[in-house]
Structures are given as C-alpha cells and as structure tokens.
Amino acid sequence: MNNLLSCKQTIKMKNKFNLSLIAVLMAGTSALTSCSKDNDDVEEPIVDVAVEAKLSDSFFDKVAYKGAMGTVDWTTGWTSFTPNANVYGATTETLGPGIITANRTLDASKVYLLSGFVYVASGVTLTIPAGTVIRGDQASKATLVVVRGGKLIAEGTATNPIVFTSNKAVGQRGNGDWGGIILLGKSTNNNPGGVGKIEGGIDAAQADHGGKDVADNSGILKYVRIEFPGIAYVQDNEINGLTLGSVGSGTTLDYIQVSNSGDDSFEWFGGTVNAKHLISINNVDDIFDFDNGFSGRLQFVIGQRSPVFADAAGQSNGIESDNSNTEFSSTPRTRPVISNMTIIGPSTPGSVVDVKHQNANLWRKGSKMVLANSIFIGAKWGIDIRDVETGAALTDGTSLIKNNIYQVADATKEVIVSNNSFATADLLRTYLTTNGNTFIAEAAAGALLTTPYTLIATPNFTLATGSAAATGATF
C-alpha cells in the first residue's frame, strides 16, 4: 500500500464508505507515517474530514461506572482547590510581550512574569518543564497564544505540575486576573472558508485558526494548572482559561485544571482534539463551551460550580454547545462525544444561587452531541434543547444522550425545549428516559459521590460506598 497516497495528496471524503476507507488508510499506509514532520516547510498528508467519533472508539476507557471517577481519585497530587492560599515565589524573569520566533525552553528554577500578549510563532516550539511557575500580569492582560503551526510542550507530572497563575499576593487573587492560554491549530471548523479569527482581542495577524489537517499537532498540555485566568478584553470578546481554536487530534490534552476563570474554563472553536482528565472549579461563565464544528472526544472531566460566581452579562451553563451563530446546519457540525463527565452545582444543599446560573446542558444552534455515562447534580435547570436542527439530530439518531444522571434544583425545568422537533418537554423526557437517563432527588444525589459539594477546600469526587453510579455505563 506504499503507493496508495502521496504526501501531497488531500483526502476529501463525502460519505460513510469513504469515512471508513480513510480509517483503513490512516492505519495501514506506511507512506502516511513515513512523511510526517513537524516543520511547516515539509509537505504532510492532509485529511480534511474526521472519522466520526463514537463511544466505541479506542480512545474511551470502557469503565463500568458513571461520572468522572470511580474509587480512585485522579486529582490527587497535582491539583489545587485553594489557589488563593498558594504561596508562589516572586517573579525573576519577564516573558513578553511579543513574538517568540525561535525554539525556547524555560527554566523551572525561575518564576516567570507573563506580560502582555506572547505569541509562539509558526514553526516554533515553546517547552515548559515540569514544576515551572508562570504568573500572569493583570494590567497587560497577559495571554499566551500558540499560533497555527506553533507548539507548546507543557508536560508536568503528577507530583510536579506546571502552574499558570495570578501575579497577585495570597488572598488578593480573583477570577480574571490575567488572560489565559490560547492554542490555534490547522484542523477544521465551520467558519466561511474554513478559517476563523479567535476572539479575545489578540493581534489580527496572529488570530487565524483552521485548515484541513484534522490530525494537526499543537503540542502537549499535561499536568497543568491554570489559575485565575479568563479576562474580558471587551464585552462579548473574552479570553477563556483554555481556548482551543481548530486544534487537531495530534495534540495531547490530559490532566488540566482551570480554577477561578473569569469567563469559560474550556472553550473549543472547531477542531478535532481529544482530551481526558479535565477539571474546572469556581469559574464565572460556562464550564465547557463547544462552537463552530468541534468534534473531538472527552472522557473523565469534572466541573464544580460555586453558587455565587456567575456571568453578570449573560448566563452560566455547565455545557453550552452551539454549531454556528449564523447557519445552524453548517458543516462540519459541532458534535462533541463525551463520556464520564461530572458537574456539581451551583446549587448545593442550603445554598442561595445567583440568578444567572441556568442549565446543566444547553444544546442549541444546530449542535449535535453524544453524551453518556455522566452525572449532573445541583444544576438550577436540566437539559435545554433549542432550535429545529438540534432536536432533529436527536430524533434521527445522529445525536445521542444516554445513561446520564441528573438532579436539578428546579424540578419544573428538568427538561426544556424551544423551537425544535420535540413539540413538548414531555416528548423530550420520553426520549431521555427511553435512553436510560434518570432524574433523581437531592437526597439521592448526595449519596452518589463522597464529598462533592466541598468548596474552598478539597472535595472528593470518587463514588460513595454503595453509589448508584457504580455500574450501568455503556459504550
């Protein structure tokens, strides 16, 4: 099969047969692997249609339990649930503002001040060793941007994570103290022409994301904490904790915590990147936000909400997923495939919840989805399905919501529909219960996990003894 594909050919698949064929080609063609290079000036095989993600894919660990963890706590050692109390050294070297134009490795013995917008140029790799601390400057809205073709290698360990945090003193830190991290790749999106400009006020010349390489590699983020990011550059043009623009599946995202983001914790604008072991605490806006044709896979992800942090200018949801703001059926369609997610709050027993908190899940503007084996407890409202194209994907089977557990503070809004193929909330509820989703009371929710409601201290998201979520996951 060596002559089946040259490095300069582009595969453009139009139907299910070809999607299957491409999987064979990618697995069995030595020409594809032999010509894979990191440098932009070397031709690479480009695949511009992703094989549709499924729960049966090898990416997913086929665990028996629902929710983000069983009896083993994968947050131990590298996370922090009290970031405002963490003592970090004074900064010893300034990074930025400007463009990094040559490969660079930081020094873990130094504490860096990230100043202004720092861009990792195309063809350049920024390497951050385990244990490095980088503190973001608020006045300059410090933000690290990896442009298309650039790479960030930030690989900590379970006992020595990399930390991006505020430059303010202990006790003085708050949501949105600095910008965040932005990765821009060459994978697909549904913007006109397949190229978008990332939001957040970054230099327009550096803001492009998108292309045709679904396997594009923007680097590695592993055992990384991002604390107090998420600044509003201008209204409705914010920087999130971790922003991902058309990032490809060659990128590694694993063991990443975003704490106290002033906007979304994680937001995807197109792309095909997969991720495991993500955790968000105490953010203001949406926890997980999908847009513009994102079609990657997620497993073992956690979001814990505070009752008091919410988006004053809009609404705060656990999941918020849109296909496109202008053309709801534009392709590629937004279609995250998610298993083993846990979202807790904002409602905790006895709490008063900010009025801007809304849904556990908001699916709208033509978004598709596969959501399975997950736990949502303490949301103000439950599942909100909006718009004809969104509902139609559930009824025609191209979307799926199955085997999830929901506990909602307002029982009258467990299920919400508007302008879609489910004429009433009862019809959507029938779909959900038929597919193994359950709605439970607050007392039952409290028996699922060990100590999930703990705020400003270390919670325990493992399954409680005798938990109803210990079995029942299906892939």
Roles of regions detected by a PLM:
Residues 36-39:
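Bacterial signal peptide processing site
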Residues 21-28:
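Hydrophobic helical h-region of N-terminal Sec-dependent signal peptides
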Residues 42-110, 114-121, 139-149, 156, ...:
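Extracellular beta-rich repeat passengers
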Residues 5-21:
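Bacterial N-terminal signal peptides that target proteins for export
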Residues 30-34:
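C-terminal motif of bacterial Sec signal peptides marking the signal peptidase cleavage site
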Residues 134-135:
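Primarily the HKD phosphodiesterase
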